[in-house]
Amino acid sequence: EITTRLVGSEMCIRDSFNPLIGLINTGLSNGLTAISDAGYITVLGLILGAMMAIDMGGPINKAAYVFGTGVLATASQMIEKGAQPGDPAVQACYIAMAAIMVGGMVPPIGIALACQFFPKKFTKEERGSKVSNFVMGASFITEGAIPFAAADPLHVIPCTLIGAGVAGFLSALFKCTLMAPHGGIFVFATVGHPLLYILAWAVGSVITAVLLGLIKKDVK
């Protein structure tokens, strides 16, 4: 009976918040669309990259990802109607998706690098997860950074946000494109300007790691 009540309470709370989250996501999506329509593709890349690192799997992260899958669908529809893959409007869709993925790959990699080069900033348990974070980051699984963000949000989240934002900005600046909705390094063969894309990913990850090394306090 207690379990039933708890489950019922959880469902009520979740249902109460779902409309609010839906409104927020709709607002974010509309704002991102407006930026894209205005032609500010590098600004869009920066925002999308940063959104992937704010809550790492939460509503803001998911809003950015859903926007990305939505523009991929839009690109497919435009091509079906006669547009060419190289048309600017189609390319803008692929550029947005590339910025989203690189932004989501930065937090785990940046944290793993920080664990490697600034070990005094992390507990033994945290340092032990660096290999899994390398794997998760390379696979575009941002959630590997969540335990670190939960343990020290005031220091970790700003670092991952800045690094991911820079990566998204550079990816868009380099006009890197991605036609796949997921896959990490396993879909790099489909990325437009792959070497520049790797550079954007590396720069964002290093920025995250260095910032963590500078502002995170030593573990006692």
Can you say where each PLM-predicted feature lies in the sequence?
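Transmembrane alpha-helical segments and their short flanking loops
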Residues: 66, 77-91, 118, 122-128, ...
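A generic hydrophobic-helix recognition signal that picks specific residues
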Residues: 1, 48, 133-136
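C-terminal TM-helix exit segments that contain a strictly Trp-centered aromatic cap at the helix terminus
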Residues: 10, 14-17, 170-171
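Single conserved hydrophobic/aromatic residue that forms the stacking wall/gate
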Residues: 1-8, 12-13
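Alpha-helical transmembrane segments and their helix-entry boundary regions
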Residues: 11, 59, 63, 156-160
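Generic multipass alpha-helical transmembrane bundles of integral membrane proteins
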Residues: 15-131
